[in-house]
Structure formats: structure tokens, C-alpha cells
Amino acid sequence: MAATVEGPELEAAAAAGDASEDSDAGSRALPFLGGNRLSLDLYPGGCQQLLHLCVQQPLQLLQVEFLRLSTHEDPQLLEATLAQLPQSLSCLRSLVLKGGQRRDTLGACLRGALTNLPAGLSGLAHLAHLDLSFNSLETLPACVLQMRGLGALLLSHNCLSELPEALGALPALTFLTVTHNRLQTLPPALGALSTLQRLDLSQNLLDTLPPEIGGLGSLLELNLASNRLQSLPASLAGLRSLRLLVLHSNLLASVPADLARLPLLTRLDLRDNQLRDLPPELLDAPFVRLQGNPLGEASPDAPSSPVAALIPEMPRLFLTSDLDSFPVTPQGCSVTLACGVRLQFPAGATATPITIRYRLLLPEPGLVPLGPHDALLSHVLELQPHGVAFQQDVGLWLLFTPPQARRCREVVVRTRNDNSWGDLETYLEEEAPQRLWAHCQVPHFSWFLVVSRPVSNACLVPPEGTLLCSSGHPGVKVIFPPGATEEPRRVSMQVVRMAGRELQALLGEPEAAVSPLLCLSQSGPPSFLQPVTVQLPLPSGITGLSLDRSRLHLLYWAPPAATWDDITAQVVLELTHLYARFQVTHFSWYWLWYTTKNCVGGLARKAWERLRLHRVNLIALQRRRDPEQVLLQCLPRNKVDATLRRLLERYRGPEPSDTVEMFEGEEFFAAFERGIDVDADRPDCVEGRICFVFYSHLKNVKEVYVTTTLDREAQAVRGQVSFYRGAVPVRVPEEAEAARQRKGADALWMATLPIKLPRLRGSEGPRRGAGLSLAPLNLGDAETGFLTQSNLLSVAGRLGLDWPAVALHLGVSYREVQRIRHEFRDDLDEQIRHMLFSWAERQAGQPGAVGLLVQALEQSDRQDVAEEVRAVLELGRRKYQDSIRRMGLAPKDPALPGSSAPQPPEPAQA
């Protein structure tokens, strides 16, 4: 690229950006500028806008330290723009020149046009951060090697086949990422980067590492995943500061034993390699991950040829929100859905091309099978076609909400197979502290969700007998003697803890204590042929030498019974210093209690119910600049203060409700009262009430728009929103539901919070659509849903001052936005309606227009309006499907598992 551009050419390019601007146009271009940040990467014609500013040289431009530009521009215009940066933005500290904002027909991100940088950029003396991701760089620009103050360099998703030796001369570099390139070797000079702390070289073609890499004395994180490494240099043991070493998905056959001696190493990821043997130091280390290796297996007779390892790069698909299907060929592919779910189809998974469809469903009680102590962590993913077996297992990664409590609990992926639900072997992958993936292998497609459950241990009991121990509580054991079963049968156990303070408060007895709650289940006949010995820890604080046996009770519960039975007199309790042992012939739930109370069964019912209740508060807030927009949320008690601090910048409203208790999966409703109604036709609105389902780890939040039939010009409307209980989950103790019924009608009421719609002045009266005459308009189609004229009017009424950002993301030119502002400068509503309807008329009849609108709303940080549009589309789709189903024209579609779907199996009762 040329380093300079002549003055007349620069002025001509700037004038092309807006020939009609007068001398004060620079002040109107500064909405792109926020403080010391200039973000032009999402604006059409960003380079022209920057050139225009460079010509005018406003004072604010000299203060810019952070600049973002899209490289999806004309190469010559991009070259001219970059050449002006050293003179016009001399204080620049961060420069982001990224592609990836545009996608191809399959949804994959497109690379930008950038292939080089002007030599003059080395004059940016203050530059510390340079991002060149998603471009077409084949070599590293020479000017980058002269940026002595550069601290972070991002080169991901380019076409680099090598890195220059001079890269090792950057004295301040602390962060370097070169993922998704074509690197085959690394320069030895890389080891001279003494300040480098994070190095990411994943998704390349590296087969060896230079020994000099051990010279990176400050390195904290090293990611070499998804390369072709067959061995590692011993010098890696010299990385004494290393904390994270990721080597999964390589061809490693051996690993240096000295890696176990790195003093600060907290994670060594060796999954999916060719490791058949490991040094004992690594095999026993708790921070090593080894899944997917053939450990202990014999080596093949003929080693595979290195040529065979040169597998063609697997195609990658990135789906946008308007796509719900994708093709898969026998070649395989890696797919990232718009909702964040990832799938990997290995080569040969399908014998013929197949189209995969997906839906992300909101959780509801009939669709989410939860055990008594399970918690839902994700929405429900449906993958179709159902039941089609793949020739190789497909990898599935689901994002989920990190559980609050992890002690004695585990995260699993639950799926439906042959009319029953089961849990898959699940591995967790941590991308960031609050961004976790649940990874599993699936042989066919169905419904999938992520749940947190008590740690489950299982084994196959042979006729010779065996021992089953709990990994969550080592003191819990089950001993199967020889002859307990004739045929091998599978048994499993779960252990649930209860806090001693909660029990003591419930009973009003400071000395009360309980053991962990034990659930035992099995397959096969309900009874064993020989008594099975169960060992439980004594209640906390109690020892076998000091306890009063008259206060020790063994309780037993067999679903679907509603009561806990005291079976202390029916078994022989053998006590040691720390444990109690007893024998049973069938499995169920067992619990040890230590209390002075006599009727322990009823207390156990209350305690078990308390174990499953969540203490929550309900909030109702109105948006400060649009009081008709109401946020409703149900929050765990410990999250209320932090959430309110975050929301009260944009919302205001009454104090949260008093604390109420709810079960996982319990339905509740929000009803607007005293003159206020919901202002939308929503699928979650039943008889004017907004439906919720409480899941403790999900957000439980909805934003709705309200209206009133009262005259707001006469006075403000003082209404309210009340919250009422709905259906309780099936697996709630019957006595809990009965207790609520005995409380009368008020048992369904939980809280009431005030809502106020302020009085409108005469000029602010409702004018939405008043006097507006537009041709009938339907945007979309019957199968994906329509947006009618009234729907678009509703959207227009929500946008307010955010409409220019939405317009730019819709592809409306900046000049057109300015023209609309000027033409309707005294009427904000008319500005919004004119922009939205003129865009809609141009899009009428074109596919993908509705998806483009939703995407623009999300990119403009108006998720609330985007969700309302989705709700309207979903309602339209339902009505359309119902109509064609009534006419007998609907194709057969696998039905959702309804409320009659079997729940996870409970222990059998003898």
C-alpha cells in the first residue's frame, strides 16, 4: 500500500462522503465520537466519515485514543484513510481494523479486504493495542514490527503461514493471539519476548515447537489447541510462571514429565490426543484433563503415516438468527448456531447429505423433566430429525448458567430417548469464569437441556458382589454381598446435604442434626436376594460414643407415598464412632435424624420441602424515559441489591416485594390491575396475565408495554401489578400443596407493586398513528411470521431517541438519516415512522427482512423491542400452524414431550 495520499485526493474523498454539508458539518458528524472513543466499524461509509473529520480537524479529534474501523471497505479508500492516522490521531492508543461484520450465504464470517498496512502507521508512538482479526493478511505488515510500544497484537482469522523473526524485538508485547491461521512453524526469536504473558496459537498447522519457546519467562497462558503437534520440547518446563497450558486436539504421543513440576500450573488440558501412557506425576495430578486419549491401550501394529494426519480443514458454519437449518455432508463440519450452541460432525458421521433443523425452546414444566433436587441451567434445544442414528457420535456444546452451589453437585446434559429422559456423560469446558460449556457426544438428535443435580454414582452389581461409594461424601457406602443378585443389575446413588442451621430454625431445637439424605435406585427386580449393607455418616456433631440412641431415628420414604416413615425399630443399627450401618433388601430414600421430637415423619416432610424451596423477591420497574415499558423480574434474595444497582440507572419503581418462597419449575403470573393493561398480543399473555415459570438459575425477567383506557391528559393513572401463583411442579409433596389450599384464595397471591403512568400534557397525548395514512403492509411470510402495519407502528412507538442507531444498522445511509431529521425536525414520532415505513416498503417481498430488523434492534441495544418482535412472530407462526393443521395440510412433526412425559426414574418401592 502507498503510505501517503495527495491532499486533493483526500479532500475529494471527504467531499464524496457528504457534498451537501456546510462549514459546521463537523460538529454534526461527532455523534460517532464518545469521549475519547471513535467507533465507525458498524456505520456504512466509516472511512469516508473519518476522512471528512480529518479534513475539518475538530478539537475533539485530537483527543481520540480508541478507533474502530471496518475493513469491509474499498481497498483504496481504506488505504487513504489509514495513511491519515499518524497526522490526525497522534494520541491513538488502540486501533481495531477488523473484518467479520459481513457473512456469506451459509452464515460464515467474511474476511476483510485488508492485506497490508501503510508504513507510516509506525509513527503512532502511543499505540499499545492493535487488532487486525478477520482480514486477508498473508504476511505481517512491516510497520507492526516497528511499533515499540505495542502491548497487545491480535491476528486471528487471517492467512498467515509464518511469523517474522523480527517479532521477537517488540519489547512491550504482553498479549499475542494468532488463532485460525495457517502457521506451520514458529520463529526461534519468539522466545525473546520476555514480557509476553498470554500466547494463543490454536487452530493452526503447527507440528513442532522451537526449543526457544522455553525462554518466555513471563508467560502465564499458552494455548496450542487444535494443531498437529506430535511432541513437546523439554524446554516447556522452564516456563515457571505458566498457569494455563492448553494442548487438546493434537497428535501428542508423549508429554514431558517435568510439566508436573511447574509451580503455578493450575490447568493442563491434554484431551483428544494420542497419549497411551503418561508419567505418574501427570497421571495423578488434579489439574490435568485427559479425556479422549487411548490411555492403557496397545499401540497399533503399523503406525499411521504422517501424510494421513494431513486431514483437510473441516468446513465451519456460523448461523445467523434468521436461519434455523443447515446442511451436513459426509465430509463433516463444525457449526455454531446463533444462540451460541456448537456442534461438530466428524467426517463420515452421515453417509448422505442431510439437513439439520434446530429450535431453542423456552423451558416449561411439561418440557423440562427435573428430579426433586435438580436445577435447570439452560433453555431447551431441539435438534431434528429425531431418531436418525449417526455413524459416528456428534459433538455437542451447550452454554449454561454456572450453578451457584457446586459442592456435591454436578452438571449434566439431559436428553430424551425412546419416550424416557436420561443423562449423558458430560464434560465441562471453561472459556471464561462465567462462560461455561457442557460438552457431550450424541448418537442421534432429540431434545437437550443442561441441569445441575446432586452428584450421582453408579455401578453394575455382579453376582459376586461389589462396593459402591459416593464421590460427593466418601462416608456414604453401599456394600453388596455375594449372591445379592442373580443377574448383573445397575444401581445408582445420590447424596443431598441440608444445612444444620436451617434444620435447627425449622425445629426450634439447637441440638437437632441430620445426616446427608441418601437416594438409592436400581434396575431389575425391586428386592435383592441378600441384605445389602448401607453406611451413613452420623448427623453432624454427633459421635457413636456420646449419642442418646432414643433420639436417633432412621427415616424411609418410598415414592409416590406422601409420608416419611420411621423404621428405626425395624432395622438393626450398628454404630461406630462416625457411622451408622444398617441392612435393607430394597432401595429408596434414607435419612438419619437426631432430635428430641417424637413425630419425626412430619418434620421430615417439612424439612425436605424446605430443601427445595427458593427464597425470592419480585420487582416491577418502569423505564425512566418511557414509563409505559415495565420490567418484571423474579430474583433470588441474595441477588436483589446488585441487580437493582445495575437497573436503577435506566429504571425506577417501588421497592422489591417481601420475600416469598417458590419451587423450581413453579408457574406464576403477573396481572396488571386498576386501569392498566398489557399493550401487546403476546404468546405468554393468557387472559391479560403474563405467564412465568420460575427456574432459580435463569433470569425470570420480561419487559412488557402497558397502556390504559383512562384519560391520561386529565390525571395520572395509578395502577398496580400483582403476582399470583400458578401450577406447582408435580413432584412437590402433596402436603405442601394442601397447606396452600387450606389458606384460602389469598394463598395464590404473592405480592402487589404500584405502577404509575404519568399525566400527559396536551401536546404529549397519544398520537401514535394519528392521521397517518400508509398503504397496507405485511413484512415477512406466513411460515416465519408477519409484521403488519400496526406491528410496525408499535415498534416505532418504542424506539424513541434510539431510532438513528437502528436506522444505521438497517442499512439506511447516514445522509438519509440526517435528511429525515431535518425534514421532520419538530416531530420525533414522524421521524421514526417515516424511517421505519420507508425501509419496510423497500424490503416488502424480500426474504430475511424481519430477521434484519430483529438483528438491527439487538445491535442497537434494544433487546426489549427485539423480544417483543419475536413474540409477535411466534404468535403469528402458531396461528398459521394451527390453521393449516385444522385444514389437514400440516406435515407430520415430532410432538413436543408434554406433561405426560415420564419424569426421571424414582427409586423403586418394594
UniProtKB/Swiss-Prot annotation:
Consequence recorded when altering residue 446 to A: Loss of the proteolytic cleavage producing PIDD-C. Unable to translocate to the nucleus upon DNA damage. No effect on the ability to activate CASP2. Complete loss of proteolytic cleavage
Transmembrane segments: none
Region (Disordered): 1-25, 884-910
GO molecular function per UniProt: death receptor binding; endopeptidase activity
Annotated consequence of substituting residue 814 to A: Loss of complex assembly with CRADD. Loss of PIDDosome assembly. Loss of CASP2 activation
Outcome of substituting residue 815 to A: Partial loss of complex assembly with CRADD
Domain ZU5: 322-454, 455-596
Keywords: Acetylation, Apoptosis, Cytoplasm, Disease variant, Hydrolase, Intellectual disability, Leucine-rich repeat, Nucleus, Phosphoprotein, Repeat
Domain Death: 788-873
Gene3D superfamilies for the chain: 2.60.220.30, Death Domain, Fas, Ribonuclease Inhibitor
Consequence of changing residue 826 to K: Partial loss of complex assembly with CRADD
UniProt GO cellular component terms: cytoplasm; cytosol; endopeptidase complex; Golgi apparatus; nucleolus; nucleoplasm; nucleus
Protein's recorded name: p53-induced death domain-containing protein 1
Organism: Homo sapiens
Gene name per UniProt: PIDD1
